[in-house]
From Swiss-Prot:
One of its GO terms (biological process) is tyrosyl-tRNA aminoacylation. Its main location: cytoplasm. Homodimer. Residues 364-468 form the tRNA-binding domain. The lineage of its organism: Eukaryota, Metazoa, Chordata, Craniata, Vertebrata. It comes from Xenopus laevis. The keyword RNA-binding applies. Belongs to the class-I aminoacyl-tRNA synthetase family. This is Tyrosine--tRNA ligase, cytoplasmic.
C-alpha cells in the first residue's frame, strides 16, 4: 500500500492521531527519497494492557505508509528502571513481551514478517555501545539526566544511578538501530529532547520523534501496568472486562479524561474506520459512526449513554482480545505467564508477629471529605447542554464552583437553595473548560428511563457540616485524594440506598450530628 500513496498520503498516515511531532520537515525530505525507518521500544516490566493497542495501531499505520519498523524489547532498560524487572526474571519477562506483543499485532492484522524484532541486550552490551555510554556520561549533566527520565523512570526519594543512565541508553538506541525516527508516548518527550541535544555531541545525527497521547485509564488517570484498577489486562476474561468497564469513569457528557471514549478514538477507529454504538430498538437502535468527532459530540450532548458506549467498547475489545487469550491458553504459554509474573503473595512470607492477612486491606471511608453544601446559584454550562455550573456554600470563605451533569434529570429550580452532599477533596478537574471543585453526590437507578436524585442531608444541617460513615466518626479526611490510589472509586462500589431510603456504605449509614443522609424515592439505587 505504501508504494501507491502520495507523499502527503504517507505523511498523513504516519502522523494521524499523534499528539506531537518533532522534525516534520526532515521526515518529509526522507519520504521523498525512501521509506522512513522507525523504531518503537517497550521496557519489559509489568504486563502489557489494552492501552498498548494505541502504539500497535500506529505501527499498523507506519507499515501502511511503507515505513520500515523495528520493535525493541528493552530488557536492559527494564532492569535499570529501579529494577522493575528483577535480573532473575528478565529473560522470562522479555519472552512474555515478545509473545504477547506479537499476538496483539496479529489480532489487528499486522503482518509480522514486515517487522524487525530485537532485544536491547543483543547490542547494548557490545564494546562499541558500552564505550558510547561512557562517552555520553562525560558530557551529560546529572540535572539533565534526571530531568529527562522524570516522566518515565520510577521516581523515588533516593534515586539509583541506573535511573540516570536510562535516558542515555534510549538516546543511543536511535543510532545503534540505524533509524530515522523514534516513536513513543508523549510521556517520553523529555527523553526525546534529551536525545536531540546530546546525540550530536557524540557526532551522531538528531532523529525525528513521533509521540502519541497517553490514553486515560479506567479511573481517568494515565493507564498503568502497576495500577490494577486503572487498566484491562490483555488476558482478562470477558467477565473481568465487563466488570472493569462497568466501574470505569465515564460520566454523562464528560469527554475529558474519559478512558472509554479515548480507547475508541485511538484504537478502534484507526483499526476499523467506524464504530457501532449498540442500543436497544426502543432507544433508536444501533448507530454507526464513521468519524470520532461526531461520536464525541453526541456523547458530550448526552445523545450516547455511557452504558451503551461501555457495552459497545466491551464487544469490540473482546473481539481484539480473543485471539490473544486463545494463544495464551496453551500449557506452555500459561507456564510462561506464571513464571514471568509469579504471585507476589506466594513469594513473600508474612513478617513474624504480623497479624495482617494477605487479603486486600479495607479502605477507611473517613478519608472522604464529605460535607453539607447549600446551592447558592445554578446556571447552564456555556459549552455543554447537559451540564450545570453551581455555586455551593460548604462553610468556607468563598463558595465552590461545581459542575454536574444533572440537566436531564433535575430542574434547576429544584437545585437552587437546596442542601446537598458534596465530596470536597477530589482533585479539581476541568469539565468543558470550567474547573469543578467538588462532586455533588446523587442516587441513581438504571432502567428504561434513568432516574437521578441528589442526596438529602438531615433537615437543619448547616453548610460545611461534616458527613461521616457510621462507625468512622473519628477518622480524618485527606487534604486531597490522590487519583492513583482511587480511594473514592473503591469505596463507591459499596455505596447504596437502603430500603428505608438511607445512604449507606456496606450497610452503614451516612450521618451528620442531626441524623442520616437520605434519598427521596430511589430504593436500591447506586450513589455517585
Amino acid at each position: 500500500m505504501g508504494d501507491s500513496l502520495t507523499l502527503e498520503g504517507k505523511a498523513q498516515l504516519i502522523t494521524r492521531n499523534l499528539q506531537e511531532l518533532l522534525g516534520e520537515d526532515k521526515m518529509k525530505e526522507i519520504l521523498k527519497e525512501r521509506p522512513l525507518r522507525i523504531y518503537w521500544g517497550t521496557a519489559t516490566t509489568g504486563k502489557p494492557h489494552v492501552a498498548y493497542f494505541v502504539p500497535m495501531s500506529k505501527i499498523a499505520d507506519f507499515l501502511k505508509a511503507g515505513c520500515e519498523v523495528t520493535i525493541l524489547f528493552a530488557d536492559l532498560h527494564a532492569y535499570l528502571d529501579n529494577m522493575k524487572a528483577p535480573w532473575d526474571l528478565l529473560e522470562l519477562r522479555t519472552r512474555y513481551y515478545e509473545q504477547v506483543i506479537q499476538a496483539m499485532l496479529q489480532s489487528i492484522g499486522v503482518p509480522l514478517e514486515r517487522l524487525r524484532f530485537i532485544r536491547g541486550t543483543e547490542f547494548q552490551l557490545s564494546k562499541e555501545y558500552t564505550l558510547d555510554v561512557y562517552r555520553l556520561s562525560s558530557v551529560v549533566t546529572q540535572h539533565d539526566a534526571k530531568k529527562a527520565g522524570a516522566e518515565v523512570v520510577k521516581q523515588v526519594e533516593h534515586p539509583l544511578l541506573s535511573g540516570l543512565l536510562y535516558p542515555g541508553l534510549q538516546a543511543l538506541d536511535e543510532e545503534y538501530l540505524k533509524v530515522d525516527a523514534q516513536f513513543g508516548g508523549v510521556d517520553q518527550r523529555k527523553i526525546f529532547t534529551f536525545a536531540e541535544k546530546y546525540l550530536p555531541a557524540l557526532g551522531y545525527a538528531k532523529r525525528i520523534h513521533l509521540m502519541n497521547p497517553m490514553v486515560p485509564g479506567l479511573t481517568g488517570a494515565k493507564m498503568s501496568s502497576s495500577e490494577e484498577e486503572s487498566k484491562i489486562d490483555l488476558l482478562d476474561s470477558p467477565a473481568d472486562v465487563k466488570k472493569k468497564l462497568k466501574k470505569a469513569f465515564c460520566e454523562p457528557g464528560n469527554v475529558e479524561n474519559n478512558g472509554v471514549l479515548s480507547f475508541v478514538r485511538h484504537v478502534l477507529f484507526p483499526l476499523k474506520s467506524e464504530f457501532v454504538v449498540l442500543r436497544d430498538e426502543k432507544f433508536g437502535g444501533n448507530k454507526t459512526y464513521t468519524d470520532f468527532e461526531t461520536l464525541e459530540k453526541d456523547f458530550a450532548e448526552e445523545l450516547v449513554h455511557p452504558g451503551d458506549l461501555k457495552a459497545s467498547v466491551e464487544k469490540a475489545l473482546n473481539k481484539l482480545l480473543h485471539p490473544i487469550r486463545e494463544k495464551f491458553n496453551s500449557p506452555e504459554m500459561k507456564k510462561l505467564s506464571n513464571d514471568a509474573y509469579p504471585d507476589a503473595s506466594k513469594q513473600k512470607s508474612v513478617p513474624k508477629g504480623s497479624t495482617k492477612n494477605s487479603g486486600t486491606e479495607e479502605i477507611d471511608p473517613s478519608l472522604l471529605d464529605l460535607r453539607v453544601g447549600k446551592i447558592l446559584s445554578v446556571s447552564q454550562h456555556p459549552d455543554a447542554d447537559s451540564l450545570y455550573v453551581e455555586s455551593v456554600d460548604v462553610g468556607e470563605a468563598n463558595p465552590r464552583c461545581v459542575v454536574s451533569g444533572l440537566v436531564q434529570y433535575v430542574p434547576s429550580d429544584q437545585l437552587l437553595g437546596r442542601s446537598v452532599v458534596l465530596l470536597c477533596n477530589l482533585k479539581p478537574q476541568k469539565m468543558r473548560g470550567i474547573e469543578s471543585q467538588g462532586m455533588l453526590l446523587c442516587a441513581s437507578t438504571e432502567g428504561e428511563q434513568k432516574q437521578v436524585e441528589p442526596l438529602d442531608p438531615p433537615s437543619g444541617s448547616a453548610p460545611g457540616e461534616r458527613i461521616y460513615i457510621e462507625g468512622y466518626e473519628n477518622g480524618e479526611p485527606e487534604g486531597e485524594l490522590k487519583p492513583k490510589k482511587k480511594v473514592f472509586e473503591k469505596l463507591q462500589v459499596d455505596f447504596r440506598i437502603s430500603d428505608d431510603l438511607c445512604a449507606q456504605w456496606k450497610g452503614k449509614n451516612f450521618l451528620t450530628k442531626l441524623g442520616s443522609v437520605t434519598c427521596k424515592t430511589l430504593r436500591g439505587g447506586s450513589i455517585g
